[in-house]
């Protein structure tokens, strides 16, 4: 293939453009995954306590892949401009490895969405919230994390329990073992607070008088951010894979036509 052929130059330009897009997508993927692993909603302790934080693992992989895509796109552009078979061969080998990692990241993130169920967080809350008798230090760490996260959620987002305050009445829980039902029908954080973060009317809150306690559950506030992040990592990654596949295919064709 002659290097001064106008058709070749046009094809080189298309491949370079394709790799510029790949590099930009890599930067965007890294930024998205950094935002996710920074845990803006501070929900990681709830996932850690389930012993399944694979969605964060998928995001860490996505961050690594994004950086690699940017670097490899630069390498590919250099190889295309120089029509260098060795550079492009090195690019192919590394890109296949990175591509496989991104496939794993997308699959992991997409499948985790079904993991965020109501029963999962309900069981965890009942078992770990204010559980002062953990069997191991690891359980103590997880119990403290779950308790602090739930206290913050209920105060900050004006919700109570997973489905509502009735969760604390219907089911056996560590909270019920530690607290008297008459004094603590549900945690104090379920009460409507004044500016000093004190219950507006504690007795009315205990009796369940509307307007003095939060009747809304917290499930949507937990699963919503997790679902959005899972779909973001999965589907943006999948879109990048689709684009990269065709760019990679075109580059392989170009490589096969370079003269020795």
UniProtKB/Swiss-Prot annotation:
Pfam families: Tetraspanin. One of its GO terms (cellular component) is apical plasma membrane. It comes from the Eukaryota. The keyword Glycoprotein applies. GO terms for biological process: epithelial cell differentiation; response to bacterium. Residues 37-59, 108-229 are extracellular. This is Uroplakin-1b. It comes from Mus musculus (Mouse).
């Amino acid at each position: 293939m002659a290097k001064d052929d106008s058709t070749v130059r046009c094809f080189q330009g298309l491949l370079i453009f394709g790799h510029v897009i790949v590099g930009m997508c890599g930067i965007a993927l890294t930024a998205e995954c950094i935002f996710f692993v920074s845990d803006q909603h501070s929900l990681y302790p709830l996932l850690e306590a389930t012993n399944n934080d694979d969605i964060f693992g998928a995001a860490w992989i996505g961050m690594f892949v994004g950086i690699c895509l940017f670097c490899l796109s630069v390498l590919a552009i250099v190889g295309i401009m120089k029509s260098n078979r060795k550079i492009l061969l090195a690019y192919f080998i590394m890109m296949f490895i990175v591509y496989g990692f991104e496939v794993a990241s997308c699959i992991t993130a997409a499948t985790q969405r079904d993991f965020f169920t109501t029963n999962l967080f309900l069981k965890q809350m009942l078992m770990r919230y204010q559980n002062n008798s953990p069997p191991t230090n690891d359980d103590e760490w997880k119990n403290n994390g779950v308790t602090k996260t739930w206290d913050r959620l209920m105060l900050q987002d004006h919700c109570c329990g997973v489905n509502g305050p009735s969760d604390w009445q219907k089911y056996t829980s560590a909270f019920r073992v530690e607290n008297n039902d008459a004094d603590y029908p549900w945690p104090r954080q379920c009460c409507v607070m004044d500016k000093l973060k004190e219950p507006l009317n504690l007795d009315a809150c205990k009796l369940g008088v509307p307007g003095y306690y939060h009747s809304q559950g917290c499930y949507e506030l937990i699963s919503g951010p997790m679902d959005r992040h899972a779909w973001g990592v999965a589907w943006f990654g999948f879109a990048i894979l689709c684009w990269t596949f065709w760019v990679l295919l075109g580059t392989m064709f170009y490589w096969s036509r370079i003269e020795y």
